[in-house]
Amino acid sequence: MPTPDLKSLLKSTFGYDAFRPLQEEIIDAALAGRDVMVLMPTGGGKSLCYQLPALARDGLTIVVSPLIALMKDQVDALQAAGAPATFLNSTLDAEESRRRIGGLHRGEYKLLYIAPERLMLSGTQEMLESWKPQCIAIDEAHCISEWGHDFRPEYRQLADLRHRFGQIPMMALTATATDRVRADIVSQLRLQEPARFIASFNRPNLQYRVTPRRSALRQVLEVIGKHDGESGIVYCNSRNGTERLAARLKENGVEAAPYHAGMDAAARSRNQEAFIRDDLQVICATIAFGMGIDKPDVRFVIHQDLPKNLEGYYQETGRAGRDGLSADCVLLFNASDVTKQTGFIEEKDDEHERAVARQLLQQMVHYAESRQCRQRVLLDYFSEKFEEENCRACDNCLEPKETFD
């Protein structure tokens, strides 16, 4: 399909006048039938890279996603725009699943979102063969790599897709992956001479800061105070931590609520919607929050505890400032976090998992303790060269370094 048609589809379905960097080239490669590897940081517009080609071509595109809530959000948005999309997952009752499968048999859909464990069932694979998919897109593709920060064993089975579906083009997408993880994704999925697209990890509007944690509540309130009425996310490492902090913030006059995987789905959804509508100023969350959250005006992200790895930290801070305006990313650092994280790592049964987790934590600690430009340390981790001498935004570039205890 010629580019002008893609542009009109971009406008009519998604409401955009122009592509973001790399999107058009990725879409052209997909429509040419190539395997494609996409590394695009959070907020760069990854989803469009498989959604638009799916709508531009005949037949069905399969989208593998590990996140049930995100599946529903994306399908709802596509359906609202008039795009024929559906999902199959464990939230559907038997009758609704049958209805959707019937629609797939009749060719009524162009996009099917499905979790990896459902996709790899033999019954699903037999149906897929009869639906003759034109492309398989694998979102969060870093989950296939044992060297990544979010390895999921069910993703490993996706390696069989190439054997089962032969020459069907595949697109692997991720927001964060080191060189080693990228190579592992290509190898595990058996991508054949893939077109590789790597967007820049540089977010010049984000002002990274690491400060010694002394009184977490007081320090969190100080950051919120600088952002009067503006939206922010505070990440905590435990579910209890999110609830305690949200309660303390409310006592101090801040509209805040918790978000974690232990809450029931309705309460989580309610808090998420309230945050997006600006009825809440602050969400106190575990890493369960944020995947696919489309809120461009988050002005600050605070990490009350040390994250387990730099990939996760980069992705979570990347939820700030998606509108391109400046935003603060503050990490409260205390050496006791390292001891605690190390204890969790040593409880893992698998020695390889322990070794990878130790290495990832070590790199996170290096970032926290570094006197170098924060942007440089982050970009270096993702093998991207930072050309500037000084980012003129992070604490290390703007002010002398305080020594940690």
Where are these regions (language model features)?
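Cys/His-rich short segments
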Residues: 360, 365, 369-405
